[in-house]
From Swiss-Prot:
Protein name in the entry: UvrABC system protein C
Domain of life: Bacteria
Entry GO terms, CC: cytoplasm; excinuclease repair complex
Organism of this sequence: Helicobacter pylori (strain J99 / ATCC 700824)
Main location: cytoplasm
NCBIfam families for this protein: uvrC
PROSITE patterns: GIY_YIG, UVR, UVRC
Intracellular or extracellular location(s): Cytoplasm
Gene behind the chain: uvrC
Family note: Belongs to the UvrC family.
Biological role stated in the UniProt entry: The UvrABC repair system catalyzes the recognition and processing of DNA lesions. UvrC both incises the 5' and 3' sides of the lesion. The N-terminal half is responsible for the 3' incision and the C-terminal half is responsible for the 5' incision.
Subunit structure: Interacts with UvrB in an incision complex.
UniProt cross-references to InterPro entries, sorted A to Z: GIY-YIG_endonuc, GIY-YIG_endonuc_sf, GIY-YIG_UvrC_Cho, RuvA_2-like, UVR_dom, UVR_dom_sf, UvrABC_protein_C, UvrC
Keyword entries, A-Z: Cytoplasm, DNA damage, DNA excision, DNA repair, Excision nuclease, SOS response
Length: 594
């Protein structure tokens, strides 16, 4: 405590970020302050050189303060910089007592640029600061389905670079385009099609009706497989905004954020209203080991969503709840980011309160559906058996694959909300000369990406104690808190043997080795994770090998033999680099004379 007491006596009054650590130097909490000295001292009560929690703080905070042994601060220029740095560090380091919201992606918009002669609908996540550009969104899902439908229903220019080619393509032949590239349609005639496209984007009911007519025509012509594609697309578009029945007389442009939860779980609902209609919505389930703090969660949700400059900002942002201090901080953050004032408020009456109540009702409904399933029970049991500090709600699983140390690759699969999240899978080309170096490279590259993609609760490594120790060293150097287990495959590893429940794999943790019965659900859960990562890595290895074989065949056609190919690969590192190299460079490597 002497170190902590000394730190408390020498605090700066500047703006900055503070970090609390326990006696083992494990990160407990990250916060920010306009005045570090004032904020940090508010956590503690110091009498006769004895430090105790401030009794005016919440029980959750008092529990954390009792564990604090060290603190560190980072000074910045102003409160806005502190707010952004705090959010970035929380996502990268995942402290024990901070709430981590993962959904920080920028949602896509559909836009049309009417400053060009033949405008087409496109998807963007970035701002195009120029006149004549019309945006629609944001879309939390279904934007691509809308776009595909528009191109199939209307004779639009099908590709961005079509006009430059000055020659009609196959889309003209199949009557999907009017060939403005060959002046077969005037600008004025095409503009009517573009305006019809706008109407379909603005009125999803009309778009769905056109899709239904197309589906019926296909069914009538016995083209059932194509009709099924339209059926599925209609279903996706219908789900885009489950609240579209809401239509306010006032043409509000609003973003709505509502939290519902308690203890260690909560649900965030986001709704986006444009022109008085809810056009899209999304939700996120949040799990926290050490209690749920609405104020902290709301702050992180707003910063995550608005940190990237968005094309269409609302007139007002409605929040279900937060403190006056946080509301003021967020107001200043938004004004600073967008150089204009956009009001943030917690509605107390009228239409806007009704919108918050609808968002809260939906959050409550999603929360109530979170009943304990068999999978949830297995997660709890795994946490207890493997002595994990928190329930592994999000897991990343790693495996490598190679053939005689060639075509070395690695794969990462992600398991969250009791399902594999294939959009989050990642593939890596590796350079390591053995399985340990390859795993080290794979895990290091993932750890270096923590700032962009926050770390999970748990890493599962395909390997033994050696691979486990590699992972622990990498995580220690990254400063992030992620728990790790490893599973080593039994030598007898046939699929038939495993399917009969005969596998006796071993699970390694920091302090124990577990040899569980094949019928143990906790073992089967870890095996399921490992087998998916193995499948993913193997498939990537096969596709890489096939691609390399094709590249070798192409080089052979150019008169370069296998031995020469190996020399070139050793020097340039990849087939892509070989292709880019000049003949002079390749000849120098092969020591050929002109």
């Amino acid at each position: 405590m002497a170190d902590l007491l000394s730190s408390l006596k020498n605090l700066s009054s500047s703006s900055g970020v503070y970090q609390y650590f326990d006696k083992n130097r494990q990160l407990l909490y990250i916060g920010k302050a306009k005045n570090l000295k004032k904020r940090i001292k508010s956590y503690f009560s110091v009498r006769n050189n004895e430090i105790t929690p401030n009794p005016r703080t919440s029980l959750r905070v008092q529990m954390m303060v009792k564990q604090i042994a060290f603190l560190e601060t980072i000074l910045v220029e102003n409160e806005q910089d502190a707010l952004i740095l705090e959010n970035s560090l929380i996502k990268q380091l995942k402290p024990k007592y901070n709430i981590l919201l993962r959904d920080d992606k920028t949602y896509p918009y559909i836009y049309m640029d009417f400053s060009i002669d033949f405008p087409i609908p496109l998807i963007t996540r970035k701002i195009l600061k120029q006149p004549g550009v019309k945006y629609f969104g944001p879309f939390t899902s279904g934007a691509k389905d809308i776009l595909d439908s528009l191109y199939e229903l209307l004779p639009l220019v099908q590709k961005k670079n079509c006009i430059k080619d000055k020659k009609a393509c196959m889309f003209y032949q199949i009557e999907r385009c009017k060939a403005p590239c060959e002046d077969k349609i005037t600008k004025e005639e095409y503009l009517k099609i573009a305006k019809e496209c706008l109407e379909m984007i603005e009125n999803k009911d009309r778009l769905i009706k056109e899709l239904e007519l197309k589906m019926e025509r296909l069914s009538s012509n016995l083209r059932f497989e194509e009709a099924l594609i339209y059926r599925d697309r209609i279903a996706k578009i219908q789900k885009i905004a489950p609240f579209t029945c809401m239509d306010l007389a006032k043409l509000y442009d609003l973003d709505i954020f509502a939290f519902y939860g308690g203890n260690n779980k909560a649900v965030l609902v986001k709704m986006f209203m444009r022109g008085g209609k809810i056009i899209s919505s999304a939700f996120e389930k949040i799990h926290s080991l050490n209690g749920f703090d609405t104020d902290e969660a709301m702050k992180q949700a707003i910063i995550n969503h608005y940190q990237s400059h968005l094309p269409l900002m609302p007139e007002q942002i409605l929040l279900s709840a937060c403190s006056n201090e946080t509301l003021k901080e967020l107001q200043e953050f938004i004004s600073h980011q967008y150089s204009k004032k956009i009001a943030l408020s917690i509605p107390k009456k009228g239409d806007k309160l009704a919108l918050i109540e609808i968002a809260m009702k939906n959050a409550q409904e999603i929360f109530s559906q979170e009943k304990t399933s068999n999978e949830d029970r297995i997660l709890e049991e795994a946490r207890s058996l493997f002595n994990l500090e928190c329930v592994p709600y999000r897991v990343e699983i790693f495996d490598t694959s190679h053939h005689s140390n060639s075509q070395c690759v690695g794969g990462m699969v992600v398991y969250e909300n009791n399902a594999f999240q294939k959009d989050s899978y990642r593939r890596y080309h590796l350079k390591g000369s053995n399985e340990y170096d390859q795993m080290s490279e794979l895990l290091t590259r993932r750890a270096l990406d923590f700032a962009k993609e926050p770390p999970p609760n748990l890493w599962v490594i395909d390997g033994g104690r050696a691979q486990l120790n590699i992972a622990l060293e990498i995580l220690k150097s990254s400063g992030s808190f992620v728990e790790v287990i490893a599973i080593s495959k039994e030598k007898r590893d046939s699929k038939a043997y495993r399917s009969k429940g005969g596998a006796k794999d071993i699970i390694h943790t920091i302090s124990h080795t577990f040899k569980l019965l094949p019928s143990d659900k906790r073992l089967q859960w870890v095996q399921k994770l490992r087998d998916e990562s193995h499948r993913y890595a193997i498939n990537f290895h096969r596709s890489t090998k096939l691609k390399n074989m094709k590249q070798i065949a192409l080089l052979k056609e150019k008169g370069i033999g296998e031995a020469s190919v190996k020399k070139l690969l050793d020097y340039f590192g990849s087939f892509e680099a070989i292709e880019k190299a000049s003949d002079q460079e390749k000849n120098a490597v092969l020591k050929k004379r002109k």
